[in-house]
């Protein structure tokens, strides 16, 4: 669990933690991003976690496959946009 800053939305703070884990390699490509696990770890409601995953998806950090779940996206090679 993290110490939340009451002046900022919780979902933004959780997003920053998860993004940092992805960027550091703690969550490698194809790692399952479990909403249930994040709910438990961060002690927040599912709707909050869904905001986090929506932003991660929009930023291209995760890919969601219906019926399978959300997974860390493979990193792009430098210069390949």
Question: Which residues are covered by each model-predicted region?
Answer:
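Extreme N-terminal segment that seeds HTH/winged-HTH DNA-binding domains in transcriptional regulators
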Residues: 1-44, 50-54, 58-63, 68, ...
